[in-house]
């Protein structure tokens, strides 16, 4: 029984953009809410990898830096004062006889809740580090796996290895301020948005594809140049650089959640149009969710979060209204 413990109406696992907006909407539905985040700060992948990237796929916002978006989402989420728990990875899931769900963290702390919203993105993210014996020597010096501050690359000769959307975006962001930007990709086709790839190819960015990194050349703790190899001909070339950025993708893992009995499809958590999973009282929103015609944009997640909250409210109180009143009429908001 959970009668001797504080029980929340909703516990949101994940403090990224979707989890934060869902926390705000929980307040709109007058639900006692807790947010549990694995990282030491809120913001998820946006704060971790794209703090200065300009996000342009949210209606009404022509462009906003990732960290500014997170700042505004945190301010919005704080409106109804949800409890925030950082630095805890949820590993255990148990349902008590009275229906209360017990979430246990890897630190052994237990969280009691009536419903759960999974806003975990693609799970825990770890970068694929460079497969080179010398990589660890240079990591944190001038070998980078993410671009935290664009200005740190100002007037520098930068080489980026990678061909996904993140690598392309970094190239476009750095091109106006760096002395030079060179992008290496092992395939001729790039994985970024067509418009972003076209912008990169029109710019001063030197695009070398198909090429791969062959060797890091340096003394002490800094890389001075890289040897690259044309994948078809095998011809090598040496490029001098100031900074090397690696974006070879991520290791993505739902971790212990895979053992909770959730239905997994294509590496994500299967949901219906109400964001319900196959487990009663457990809902999902954002990149973690999989359903037909899923829109993989932050804007899409901003719809899924409130949908999951409304479903949680209906689960707790079948007689409740289907959705919250509009924010323009909410007494707490209009009096601020």
Curated annotation (Swiss-Prot):
Binding of FAD occurs at 37, 45, 50, 90, 125, 287, 328
Q: Which Gene Ontology MF annotations are present?
A: ferredoxin-NADP+ reductase activity; flavin adenine dinucleotide binding; NADP binding
**Cofactors per UniProt?**
FAD
* SUPFAM superfamilies cross-referenced by the UniProt entry: FAD/NAD(P)-binding domain (SSF51905)
UniProt name for this protein: Ferredoxin--NADP reductase 1
Assembly with partners or alone: Homodimer.
Which key words are in the record? FAD, Flavoprotein, NADP, Oxidoreductase
Top EC category? oxidoreductase
Cofactor comment in the record?
Binds 1 FAD per subunit.
Reactions catalysed, as given in the entry: 2 reduced [2Fe-2S]-[ferredoxin] + NADP(+) + H(+) = 2 oxidized [2Fe-2S]-[ferredoxin] + NADPH
